[in-house]
From Swiss-Prot:
InterPro entries assigned to the protein according to its UniProt record, in alphabetical order: Ribosomal_uL3 (IPR000597), Ribosomal_uL3_bac/org-type (IPR019927), Ribosomal_uL3_CS (IPR019926), Transl_B-barrel_sf (IPR009000)
Keyword Ribosomal protein: yes
Molecular functions (GO terms): rRNA binding; structural constituent of ribosome
Protein name as annotated: Large ribosomal subunit protein uL3
Pfam families the UniProt entry points to: Ribosomal_L3 (PF00297)
HAMAP family according to UniProt: Ribosomal_uL3_B
Subunit structure: Part of the 50S ribosomal subunit. Forms a cluster with proteins L14 and L19.
Amino acid sequence: MKMIIGRKLGMTRVFVGDKVVPVTVIKAGPCFVVQKKTIETDGYNAVQLGFEEAKKVNKPMEGVFKKAGVNPLKVLKEFRVEDPDKFEVGQEIKVDIFSEGDKIDITGWSKGRGFAGAMKRWGFRGGPKSHGAKFHRELGSVGQHSEPARIFKGKKMPGQYGNERVTILNSEIVKIDVENNLIAVKGGVPGARGGLVLIKSAKRG
């Protein structure tokens, strides 16, 4: 499986033949393999990648990077793989592992919108806007009184909105700029500009 870590730069458009295609530009890599995990030692197979050089790290992490033979890195993310032996600790992973036309799964973190009410968070209709109503943007009924005398788990209520992990499946790579470590992906990608994204080859592609 191919995978890399990147940052969303923003959206633009490119011409493919006679069509205009909206794309999201991602600065992907270079990443380094910091650690390998196997079923024998950890109970599962995975590879840990590091991205972006860090100015300062604590002593334990300094030892981890020294053991891997790489400079201290800011972002560490783990990817499940079937065969970790295909990777070497300290190996550099660049954007050239992908090709134009490849299908990929992209994971990002949606924009955080803070504490939001039910109308904004869930699209509730709200109450009447006039004629003596005092029920404008309220939630409405959340359950019964005496039985079960509690609110069921999962009830749509006000709370933290956004800042959730979101994965877009089967996105298509439209263009790759190997020199500048850039990928142009068809359509939108979750998160704000500068947000972290995890890219891996499509599972269902």
